[in-house]
Amino acid sequence: MNKLFFKIILSFLIFLSAVNANKIAVVTKVKGLVEIMPTGKKLFSKLKAGSILADGDKIRTGTSGFAAIIFIDDKSTLKLKGNSEAVITGQRTAASISKKINMDSGTIRATIKKQNSSFVIQTPTSVASVKGTDFWLLTDPDKGDQVIGLEGIVSLKNIDTGQDVDVVQGMSGISTPDGDIGVEETEASSIPTDPSDSNEGGPSQFKIYLEGPNGTQKVMVIEYQ
């Protein structure tokens, strides 16, 4: 998707968020099995690209699933790989959204624009806090967390001990359920592949799914090159 296309989408979403403040992000890509449990609901349903996410929505991916999400205030992105589960939350303050991702398990890439608001990913083991960076986070409730720094600095804190480390480009932070935390050089083989890095040429279309006041769903279709 080109930059002009994203500008059009984001302009529309910023307008939408002004009307409905709990709308915080839009799903830009879905591959394989990806499901959503909307905030206030108890059941999962299929997630489609173009869906608008609200504060508190829960997303999970199947073994080969993948989802890409862009926040409407600053174009920060999240990418969830297979076997991942996360709750997307955001609190609006003036022109920005303070974002927190509660992640139970899986693999996620976060590319965060420099901002005044906070961005936090919390797992059962750790808390990762950033302001403008690019990193992978792999979490397992039994084994703990690995944060792989691609750009900028990530502050990684172990919940059990309260100890923290800074993770920079080329380094990986390790945090375990028993309280151990440290930093080591990243092995190239440990960096996950990003499915969205592959180029997909040719004209296409993007659908945005909107819900009316009576619960009916409408679809806005945008053609792009």
Task: Give the ranges of each region predicted by the language model.
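Active-site-proximal inter-transmembrane loops
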Residues: 127
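Short coil/turn motif common to extracellular beta-sandwich-like domains
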Residues: 24, 55-56
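Glycine- and acidic-residue-biased ligand/ion/polar-headgroup-sensing regions
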Residues: 22-41, 62-66, 82-84, 88-91, ...
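A short, solvent-exposed beta-strand micro-motif common in secreted/extracellular proteins
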Residues: 57-61
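C-terminal interaction modules
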Residues: 2-16, 20-23, 43-49, 62, ...
